[in-house]
């Protein structure tokens, strides 16, 4: 699978948004990243893979976390056919990188899942975190559960289940984008339900909204925790 780098920055850009990330380079020194050939030089990449169905907000989640519209987004069709990344150098020599990687939509059908997963099986093995994106207003997890059982079970310790579109949780309001107490209660129940259904610790299930920039700090913090276990 082709990997296209859409943007490249220094980690300072990201740690300005999430100050706890300034400790990440030191935390990752005890780990070897994925070897990547970049512009006739070899680097170590510490990849965060964003996985989920098309249209559930993988690309917009990366845009929201990084603060850059680096990934093409669409509510009605799949934009990602190959792997696209936003990269952050972890040292002045630019030999180590933190990589936010947007992968093609999966959990669509068994045939397409097998095709895509075969292409990036090596990426799953070497990545440092998998962000599996769901939606707060979805109820059918049949394909997602099948995918977890068949392909993702070995990586559970590195997975964050990210429930996007928290602002769509009932009861919705047109008067404010802030979550109401009732919405938060329903989202907490959603977290508990998803945790039980997928047999994942509740701390690894986070609700947020990429569009409204809700709870992004909690999502990024859990990604950090999964990368540094």
Where are these regions (language model features)?
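Inter-motif core of Ras-like GTPase G domains
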Residues: 112-138, 150-155
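Canonical P-loop GTPase G-domain recognition
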Residues: 169-229
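Conserved G1/Walker A P-loop phosphate-binding module
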Residues: 2-99
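A short helix->loop->beta-strand "cap" motif at the edges of active sites that frequently abuts
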Residues: 155-159, 203
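Conserved nucleotide-binding/hydrolysis micro-motifs of P-loop NTPases
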Residues: 105-107, 137-139, 165-169, 211-214
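Flexible beta-alpha connector loops of hexameric P-loop NTPases
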Residues: 105-113, 176-182
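Structural beta-sheet core signal
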Residues: 50, 132, 161-163
């Amino acid at each position: 699978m082709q990997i296209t780098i859409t943007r490249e920055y220094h980690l300072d850009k990201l740690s300005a948004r999430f100050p706890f990330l300034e400790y990440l380079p030191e935390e990752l020194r005890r780990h070897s990243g994925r070897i990547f050939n970049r512009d006739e030089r070899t680097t170590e990449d510490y990849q965060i893979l964003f996985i989920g169905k098309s249209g559930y907000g993988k690309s917009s989640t990366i845009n929201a976390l990084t603060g850059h519209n680096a990934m093409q987004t669409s509510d009605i069709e799949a934009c990602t056919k190959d792997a696209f990344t936003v990269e952050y150098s972890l040292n002045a020599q630019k030999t180590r990188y933190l990589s936010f990687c947007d992968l093609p939509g999966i959990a669509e059908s068994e045939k397409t899942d097998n095709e895509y997963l075969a292409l990036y099986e090596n990426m799953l093995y070497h990545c440092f975190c998998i962000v599996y994106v769901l939606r707060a207003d979805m109820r059918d997890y049949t394909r997602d559960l099948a995918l977890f059982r068949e392909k993702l079970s070995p990586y559970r310790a590195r997975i964050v289940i990210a429930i996007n579109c928290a602002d769509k949780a009932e009861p919705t309001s047109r008067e404010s984008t802030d979550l109401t107490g009732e919405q938060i209660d329903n989202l907490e129940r959603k977290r508990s339900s998803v945790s039980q259904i997928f047999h994942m610790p509740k701390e690894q299930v986070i609700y947020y909204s990429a569009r409204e920039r809700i709870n992004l700090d909690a999502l990024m913090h859990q990604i950090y925790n999964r990368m540094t276990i």
